[in-house]
Regions:
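Hydrophobic/aromatic residues within the transmembrane alpha-helices of Major Facilitator Superfamily
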Residues: 7, 11-15, 43, 75, ...
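Small-residue-rich segments of transmembrane alpha-helices in multi-pass membrane proteins
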Residues: 34-44, 101-109, 134, 162-164, ...
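Hydrophobic transmembrane alpha-helices of multi-pass small-molecule transport proteins
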Residues: 124-146, 291-310
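Hydrophobic alpha-helical transmembrane segments of multi-pass membrane transport proteins
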Residues: 8-15, 19, 68-90, 179, ...
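Structural motif at transmembrane-helix junctions in multi-pass transporters
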Residues: 25-29, 83-99, 192-196, 250-266
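C-terminal transmembrane-helix exit sites in multi-pass transporters
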Residues: 100, 106-126, 273-293
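Hydrophobic alpha-helical transmembrane segments in multi-pass integral membrane proteins
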Residues: 45-53, 108-121, 177-186, 243-255, ...
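Membrane-interface interhelical linkers
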Residues: 1-8, 15, 22-26, 31-35, ...
């Protein structure tokens, strides 16, 4: 049951990304599109909390006994989002996808192995290590290799004189992924402290919304907003916030139960499989890209990796 839930919430992320991309084209700003997503997600979580009788605000007693870092989930989510926005035009789509994924896998294993942030302690056994290697191979076969082969000619045209080092940006991509895994662990701990995953998710999303709002006000992208275009936007694009909120809530619920590494692993597998399905059938306005044989091999490596990590 937990495994299926982890896969399911991961599969929502590519759909959320497609909806956010559509909204970004309408409002002409990635930050403004993110603000809509965060705000709608926060509202959705607030309604769920009210319906369940869960308080939106925490008491002073709970605030005092909860470590300060437990409230960093929203900040980490915001930093991860901002990093992806900044990295895309510099590194391209392939590295912007693969580097954060590697960062997430690495950090989730470290969190589990050392029990960081009071998470479930799951030492890295030899079988789990092999599972991690299998996951990385699967990700490379599915995401990196097909795009790399297509872009090889363009990359070969770049010379050292005209191609500045991108090492720091690549390192930023890995760190961004590590922050996202840390967010899962922190939100899971906060949910445990509050005895409510929905309240933890609401607090995280509220902080994220505030931070995105600060960025939007600073860059003044709201001046480009045209209400006439916003009214013409397909209603489904507003579901992006709902999907994002569901992802954060489910991760906060699952992390204390099965460990951060398992949550991140299942989410990534669900995310990749969902992306392949979208490309295969050209769903959500995506260009139709039939699954390649090498990607099928990659999926097999993914499932072997999941079995190695989850069963041992």
């Amino acid at each position: 049951m937990y495994l299926l839930l982890g896969l399911f919430v991961g599969s929502l992320l590519p759909i959320q990304t497609a909806f956010n991309s559509k909204m970004r084209g309408i409002v002409q700003s990635p930050f403004l599109a993110s603000l809509f997503s965060f705000a709608i997600g926060t509202l959705f979580l607030a309604l769920i909390a009210i319906f369940q009788g869960v308080p939106l605000l925490i008491t002073s007693d709970v605030f005092a006994r909860t470590p300060w870092w437990a409230y960093l989930g929203g900040l980490l989510g915001m930093l991860g989002l901002t990093a992806n926005i900044l990295l895309f035009p510099i590194l391209g789509s392939v590295q912007t996808v693969i580097l954060p994924i590697l960062g997430q896998l690495l950090m989730s294993i470290l969190i589990d192995h050392f029990g960081l942030f009071h998470t479930l302690l799951r030492p890295l056994s030899f079988i789990r290590f092999l599972g991690l290697i299998s996951l990385i191979v699967g990700v490379l076969l599915i995401v990196f290799l097909p795009s790399y082969l297509q872009q090889k000619r363009q990359l070969m045209k770049e010379t050292k004189e005209h191609a500045p080092s991108k090492f720091l940006w690549q390192l930023t991509g890995i760190i961004a992924g590590m922050l996202m895994s840390t967010q899962v662990a922190i939100n899971g701990f906060l949910g445990k402290q509050l005895h409510s995953s929905i309240q933890a998710a609401f607090i995280s999303f509220s902080i994220g919304t505030f931070l995105v709002l600060v960025v939007v006000l600073s860059e003044k992208s709201y001046r480009k907003l045209q209400l006439s275009l916003l009214k013409q936007a397909p209603k489904y694009v507003y579901l992006a916030g709902f999907f994002g909120a569901s992802y954060v809530f489910c991760n906060a619920y699952l992390a204390p139960l099965i460990g951060t590494g398992a949550v991140v692993t299942l989410s990534l597998v669900g995310q990749i499989i969902s992306s392949l399905v979208i490309d295969q059938f050209g769903l959500l306005g995506a260009i139709k890209k039939p699954i390649k044989f090498i990607q099928v091999i990659g999926i097999i490596f993914l499932f072997i990796g999941v079995l190695g990590i989850e069963l041992y």
